Amino acid sequence: MSLILSNNYQALGESFSQQTLPAPVGQPSLLLWNEPLAKALTIPFTKDNDAELLSQYFSGNQLIEGSKPVAQAYSGHQFGHFNPQLGDGRAHLLGDIADTQGQRWDIQLKGSGVSDFSRQGDGRCALGPALREYIMSEAMFALGVPTTRCLAVVTTGENVYRERPYDGAVVTRIAASHIRVGTFQYFAARGDTDSLKKLTNYAINRHFPELIANSSENSSDNSDALKADNVISSQQVLEFFSAVLSKQIPLVLSWLRVGFIHGVMNTDNTTISGETIDYGPCAMMNAYHPETVFSSIDRNSRYAFGKQISIMQWNMTRLAETLLPLVDSDEDDAVEKIEPLLTQFHQDLQQGYLTMMAAKIGIDEPAEGDGKLINDLITLMKEQKLDYTQTFTALTDSLNDNTTEEPLTDVLNEWLPHWNSRIESFKSSAHTLMVSNNPIVIPRNHHVEAFLDSCQETGDLTALNKFLAVLRQPYTEIAETKNYQDAPVDGDKDYHTFCGT
């Protein structure tokens, strides 16, 4: 049995990344291993049989065959302010691997040591944030949200020093790629059009190869020119941008559907592939309010729950700016060509939001008046501080047994008749639709925090594994589900999240 990595991103050249080895750790020990994900990635090892080898590979102590580790370069707008040089300050891209369907996936270590992008950081990660990323990404995957995932968490046997000493860990992240809006900004800020072309061509081949096929079919020249590093047409760039936009719509709408608050939607945390990335300061909605913020560093509520659609539009506009030189040498003409795509993106997001929220109350095809029905509901939820998940679960259950929980009936007594009248003729199909769009359990903040504390204190994963088993079936009730459905007794008072990984 062997595991061999390819190095497709590394082949782009030294301007895209820094070659650097992970820093060895003292006593690596495999804590969590994502067996289903490993199987999908055709990784031929198991925790039971290969724990020692896996701890060496995924701590960075031993290189996987074929691996040429790099720290990737990128820029980014952080809370609206541009930083021209960010990059992987404590992460190493080991390489990429194909899954059983032939799709390629990046394998990246986080907390694996310093690079030229570390900015005085120590390059390390504490165990708590590593566990948070594992829990949250697995929960989001099960909820049907596009997301990066965690393959492994390895403890290092060393302390990480923050406000106090913590156990250290290295987490392995799997992503369709780690190309960010900030990656494009990195080269645009430097006026490096050749590298922008190279990056765009790579991103098309990696994520949207159908654009190459379409261009080849429509071209009078069917030579290998389209495959060359820097040969890319204006039309291809526009089609690429449109394809990237289409990836962001299900991403941000899925966040809103399940009550997820990312917390740090900087352009360096916005992927071209449309995957959720960076779970450091994320949280889940309890009592509904569109201005909910948990991130301790989001002091101006820039990334509040209800602002996530508008921020995604802002981020995509920043991506559009980087592509202008590839669209047309005349900037005004380039803007004229790319602006309609952003306008359409805005319209698609608005329509998508209506369709998503309508599905949460059992309406498959929104009609005139449904927008008001939805707005009336969420206004009541905000005013009465109703729990986001529990409200939609109760409405779903009411179609199954024709009763609504008394507290909810009291609060929604004026709204419920309008809703019942709207879905009267298709209650059975409405119930089916609601079941698939309204999770009965989410990774609630207080439960996640409790497991992070207990795992760090005791090292016992028994209870955490039960929690993960529930989170992996968020639309189906199993024996343990009821243990994790409760909202926090004191609400979200004084709850804050922090960047960790």
UniProtKB/Swiss-Prot annotation:
Its EC number is 2.7.7.-, 2.7.7.108. It comes from the Bacteria. One of its GO terms (molecular function) is AMPylase activity. It catalyses: L-seryl-[protein] + ATP = 3-O-(5'-adenylyl)-L-seryl-[protein] + diphosphate; L-threonyl-[protein] + ATP = 3-O-(5'-adenylyl)-L-threonyl-[protein] + diphosphate; L-tyrosyl-[protein] + ATP = O-(5'-adenylyl)-L-tyrosyl-[protein] + diphosphate; L-histidyl-[protein] + UTP = N(tele)-(5'-uridylyl)-L-histidyl-[protein] + diphosphate. Pfam families: SelO. PANTHER family: PROTEIN ADENYLYLTRANSFERASE SELO, MITOCHONDRIAL. Nucleotidyltransferase involved in the post-translational modification of proteins. It can catalyze the addition of adenosine monophosphate (AMP) or uridine monophosphate (UMP) to a protein, resulting in modifications known as AMPylation and UMPylation. This is Protein nucleotidyltransferase YdiU. It comes from Colwellia psychrerythraea (strain 34H / ATCC BAA-681). The gene is ydiU.
